[in-house]
Amino acid sequence: MKKLFFIAISLIMATMLYAEDYKSINFEQLPASTQKLVNAHFADNPILAVKATDTWFRFNREYEIIFDDGVTIDFDSDGQWTEIECYGAPVPFFMLPDKIVKYVRHNFHQEKIVEIKKLPEGYKIEYDSGIELLFDKNSELVSFEWE
């Protein structure tokens, strides 16, 4: 009986540990660095929704802003962007290092970027054609995949 009780408690704790709690918030509740970026570069782009996600027993909070033109930007708990989705919208190239922008515009100018991720090891760029590029922290191309 003790084993069964321990297993049940363990399952409940594991569920709580990995559960995510989504909620809508006001723009003013975003970290100051996020507000500054949005006000500086997206002031003319109406915001449809601002969401906060609490994870890991609410020790970590992530944010998502959905804009009217189809751009969605995710931010970490420090207010730094982590992912950009640009389905049907222009890519905000100012958020990428210049070296990556030059490479992408020169070599893949006819492809449409749909997602950009900032990773611990660099940047990942995904195209609607299935091409994925991985750049290191020095903006050097390290991986090219075509799905």
Identify the function of each model-found stretch.
Residues 21-147:
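Interaction-mediating elements
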